[in-house]
Design a protein with these regions (language model features):
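Short, flexible active-site-proximal loops enriched in glycine and acidic residues
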Residues: 13
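Bacterial N-terminal signal peptides that target proteins for export
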Residues: 1-10, 19-21
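Exported/periplasmic ABC-transporter solute-binding proteins
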Residues: 25-72, 77-81, 85-90, 98-103, ...
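Basic, amphipathic juxtamembrane/active-site segments
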Residues: 94
Length: 259
């Protein structure tokens, strides 16, 4: 009798294991680098559910282009406008678009270095002109921060002066140029600056020079694991995920904020 009960228990365990294995999925995720530090914290926690994440990073503009041209990933994370465009173009399952977080742009310098005054647009302009080199994302790479910074320089009337001494980042944090001594100032999304050791954030871009970018996720129409993709999006709105998002310098959407 005892042997029969042991065999029965083992049978139930095997069935449960097989069911869990069947539910587990390998999710290919194409994501903006602005969420890289969030993934560093949350990917292992989501993978504890049995799913596995394969993360590929690309600027938001490049994500739209690559997916539009036929590249398939299970879940996409980009700017909200990028996800909306891909949904309208039939690349993202309608109704899966989920606002994840918003991020402003900031300024960083080498840790321990004097922090320039960036309290006003005019002070920020003077700080840029005084720097030996300024690092920001290459606008041609398709990232939101690079495109906005190009507009800021044009508005301040210093595009020529800054670009003559600029270090343009492509696929690397702009703060890495500061760490290597190749730039005095780095400008990028705040979470990306906070993710680089050896630099200190001076503060956000001043006044109306600031640009807050909302980021969203969505499930690709050709995903092999759409249910697992939806589970990932739901997880990113959980209290545990919200805490990690805030800790990495992003702002969760109002409806998702912990009370």
């Amino acid at each position: 009798m005892l042997f029969s009960m042991v065999r029965l228990a083992a049978g139930f365990a095997a069935v449960a294991f097989c069911a869990q294995a069947a539910a587990a999925a390998e999710l290919k995720v194409l994501t903006t680098p602005a969420l890289s530090e969030v993934w560093h914290d949350l990917a292992p926690k989501f993978e504890a559910t049995g799913h596995k994440l394969i993360l590929v990073y690309a600027p938001s503009g490049a994500i739209t282009k690559r997916v539009t041209e036929g590249e398939i990933h299970d879940v996409l994370f980009s700017t909200t406008s990028g996800i909306e465009t891909l949904t309208k173009n039939g690349k993202v399952i309608a109704g899966t678009g989920t606002l994840i977080a918003s991020s402003g742009m900031g300024v960083a310098v080498l840790k321990g270095a004097p922090k320039p005054d960036i309290s006003t647009p005019e002070a920020f302009k003077k700080a840029l002109l005084a720097a030996k080199s300024v690092a920001y994302t290459d606008p041609a790479a398709g990232g939101a921060s690079g495109a906005h910074m190009a507009k800021v320089l044009e508005r301040l009337g210093i595009t020529k002066e800054i670009n003559a001494k600029a270090k343009l980042g492509r696929g690397v944090p702009t703060a890495s140029f500061v760490v290597k001594g190749e730039a005095d100032i780095a400008i990028q999304q705040l979470p990306e600056l906070l993710g680089v050791q050896g630099v200190e954030v001076v503060g956000p871009l001043p006044g109306d020079l600031q640009n807050v970018t909302p980021f969203a996720g969505g499930v690709h129409v050709s995903s092999a694991n759409p249910d697992a993709g939806r589970a990932l999006l739901k997880f990113l709105r959980s209290p545990e995920a919200i805490a990690a998002i805030k800790a990495r310098g992003l702002e969760p959407p109002p409806a998702a904020k912990a009370s």
